[in-house]
Amino acid sequence: MDRRKYFGTDGVRGAVGSDRMSPYFVVKLARAAGRFLAERLEREGSPSTEGSLAVILGKDTRISGYGLESAMVAGFASVGVSALQTGPLPTPGVAYLTRAFRLPLGVVISASHNPYGDNGIKFFGEDGRKLSDAEELRIEQLIDVEDGKPDAVAARWGRARRIVGAQDRYVEFCKSAFPNSMSLKGLKIVVDAANGAGWDVAGKVFRELGADVSLLGCEPNGYNINDGVGATHPENLRAAVLAQSADYGVAIDGDGDRCLMADNEGNLYDGDDLLYVIARGKLQDKDGLRSLGGVVGTVMCNMGLQTAFSRLGVPFARSGVGDKLVLDLMLQKGWRLGGEGSGHVIVLDKHNTGDGCIAALQALQAERVLGKKLKEIAAEWSRIPASQGSFRLADAPNWEFRVKDETEKLRKELGDSGRVLVRPSGTEPIVRLLVEAPEMETARRGVERLRLAALAGD
């Protein structure tokens, strides 16, 4: 059972001004994270000294990021930890810089694909991976005993410094994921950065690799992150690609860790498609399947994807939802590719967290390796009809038993030809529903049966 009360599936997240996302709480969170670092150094036999502790601190473009960043800096400084600030930078960029600077912690202020009224905090360790549940739980314990704890003595207070060129470092890192022998010359690509953290870097990545780049969602004003743009609104990317006669469109979300693509015919490609395309490309590598190992998806990945990988002889396994759980299973199995339909794709020989720009580059690389268009590669697998829905926890007290009974009935009816998933969200007070079936109408009816069962009351 998950004992964490502040952290969810992707850090701490909430409405700005709420108990979990106020300057007061963020100061406490930063102080607790700083004490967590000091504890770890003590255990490792290298206690901190003046100026020895520092963290990378990045953010997206939300208006609240300015105040929460200041609160985070103040909290860290008061317990002797310096903050190296990147300014707006995609989450995978902060993960990369944490490793590159050999620092013990990276921090991102972002609520990912959520609207500007939300914000969040997530932490990365020295290896660029998100902290484990146990590490997050320890930080929570330190938050709860924070009141009354003394500040560091004046001589050991931390500093705040800007990292010059953080964005350019990240651009070069992304470009290194694309072979030097290949170029994007001749391609016109629409890049949609969701008015978020990637607004100043995503376009540069593709332009500097030779593409003719047109920008969408690259005019942040603090309030328009994910507002009708980005990976959560692919219909606008598709429209822009068609209107501009572009070859492809690449949409990332507000913090740049997920990606969706569109082609010149208006076809959209989600994370499931990208997993298949990238895997097909990697099977052409010198060591092929031996190097790839297998592919990790989540419980939300379409059944058709699993069937397609089976035909290729590629092992496939499912994790829980969230790129942290995907990565955990990848590492456990020693596999190099994983992701989820929402667009989080982890290519482990390139980066150890989801990265929207790198995922798109890997898909474009697969095109060149296979000598096929994205459409042709993705057409090699077929989706099983799927319907999704949800209900609010506030509307359905004691829903578990009612939904369990209906779930068992549906699974018995579908047998091996479909799938039923009931999953409480890790970031919102809702329960998500998924039914896959041979026909869409059957899937839709299944979701409605589950929803009505939940709302039926006692």
Predicted segments with their positions:
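An N-terminal, well-structured beta->alpha segment
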Residues: 1-74, 78-79, 105, 159-187, ...
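Gly/Ser/Thr-enriched, mixed-charge loops and adjacent short helices
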Residues: 1-2, 119-244
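Buried hydrophobic positions in well-ordered alpha/beta secondary-structure cores of metabolic enzymes
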Residues: 10, 57, 94, 107, ...
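N-terminal small/polar loop signature for handling phosphorylated ligands or for N-terminal nucleophile
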Residues: 39-48, 53-118, 204-262
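Short glycine-rich phosphate-binding loop at a beta-alpha junction
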Residues: 44-60, 188-191, 293-299, 336, ...
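Proline/glycine-rich low-complexity loops and linkers
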Residues: 93, 137-172, 264-341, 346
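Gly/Ser/Thr-rich active-site loops/lids in small-molecule metabolic enzymes
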Residues: 130-132, 215-216, 267-286, 356-366, ...
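Phosphate-binding and adjacent anionic-ligand microenvironments
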Residues: 246-248, 286-458
